[in-house]
Amino acid sequence: MIEEDALHKNQPHMDLSSKPIFLPSIAVLLFFACSGFLVPHIEAASGYSNLVYNSCANQTLTDPIESYSQTLSSLLGILTAKSLHSSFFKGSVGDDHAAFFGLFQCRGDLSNANCYNCVSRLPALSKRLCGESLGARVQLSGCYIQYEADGVAENSEPELLYKLCSETEAGGSGFEEMRTEAFAAVEMGVKSSGNNGFYQETSGEVNLMAQCQRDLDICECGECMTNAVQVAQEECKSSVSGQIYMGKGSLSYTFYPNGIPSTNSHHGTRFCFCFFSFLGHHD
């Protein structure tokens, strides 16, 4: 029996209309097919499967190994299947002899398809990175998975799980002011975004993204982001970019001194591919 808490998300609509191209026909039979498609915002469509970090429990599978392995495989299979329609799910699988609790979460700007593509990589990756550990957390840039066996002793792990600060530092171009302004909006933003704790904003030349674990209430989410901002300020200092991963939330920022690249996250860029077939006439 599995206990579940899933939150569903609608997949964004994409205009797939096509525009025909007309060319003159001179002594040839011209057949063409032209189809247009949209390339979504780069952050939402790519770069979500890069490994950020992983942590593995010290305890490993012991007798009965087969029972634990089967239970864990069942849990990972369920988490993967749920990611087809949800961006967050947590549940437990097993009985008194072998039970596992687990969850996954996808980044708030990923479509259902990209969420599934991201999560489906995690079972094999966690097996390769953590082997027979009774607990693991594997974080990709677009999603993460976490699981542990019932009865595994929890380490008093710090609130900060992982940080990555750019070695490049910003010069005197108003960076501190713009980043401070962006950080100031985070706590309120995750509370009022209406997007289940996901927040993305641009302040001047600073692009910022923040997300809380979906089972946090508004106050817990706000507190998590306040702590993440403090870590970013203390640890990343003047770095032009930083990624902060807390126990139940994440914060990232990037400073673009030459201006944020122009992208259209709603409509994407339209391309048209044409295929031609020429049938010539011979005398």
Predicted regions, residues:
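Extracellular secretory-pathway ectodomains and N-terminal mature segments of eukaryotic proteins
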Residues: 2-283
